UniProtKB/Swiss-Prot annotation:
Its cofactor is pyruvate. It is a peripheral membrane protein. Binds 1 pyruvoyl group covalently per subunit. The keyword Acetylation does not apply. HAMAP family: PS_decarb_PSD_A (MF_00664). Signal peptide: none annotated. The active site is at S201. This is Phosphatidylserine decarboxylase proenzyme. One of its GO terms (cellular component) is plasma membrane. Keywords: Cell membrane, Decarboxylase, Lipid biosynthesis, Lipid metabolism, Lyase, Membrane, Phospholipid biosynthesis, Phospholipid metabolism, Pyruvate, Zymogen. Heterodimer of a large membrane-associated beta subunit and a small pyruvoyl-containing alpha subunit. The record marks G200, S201 as: Cleavage (non-hydrolytic).
Amino acid sequence: MARRPDLKTGPARLAALVRTSVPPMHPAGLPFVGASLAVALAGRKSRWLRNAGVASAAANAAFFRHPPRTPPTRPGVVVAPADGLICLIEEAVPPSELRLPATPLPRISIFLSLLDAHVQRAPLGGEVIAVEHRPGLFGSADLAAASADNERNSIVIRSPEGAEVIAVQIAGLLARRIVCDVEPGDTVGLGDTYGLIRYGSRLDTYLPAGSDILVDVGQRTLAGETVLAELPR
């Protein structure tokens, strides 16, 4: 009779520990990790090249990590679309390319450093009704001017109850690629992954007027988990 693997001490246990300890990686990171490992393999006879390739692979795997998150279950909330630091809370007109009324709305800006996970998650569950990309500059994403001047990609999500929330991916000083995996007509759940920005960036979230903001400037957020606000009733 064949023996069952020992899940407490055997290789299966080690594999389980690795799976629970090391977060998965977003598919967008595979080319970067693969290229770094290829450099390490090609330069395996050179200690410098080998170490540089392995270090680059590890850094890219960490940058593109895609940690699991558990969204809140209570209704009527907006969650953070990104990990990072809240750098601004103010009222501002939504991006002009969305062709929405020029009425200022509450806006929460989250700055992502190189050390943060850079996947973006839906701040609201519902239907994606608009996606608009606008070319721009690549200034420092923590500056107030970044919302207006930098390259950006905006999505509008409408909940089944009719509330609309805007999430804007903004490229930063090092960011050169905004990835958005949703299109108008798609349905997203609260906290679902919808995109990524490579190497330093910012996320602006525009809320419906009358929303009750529950966070402060300087507070850190976890994408898909931190509640930014309660929608007006």
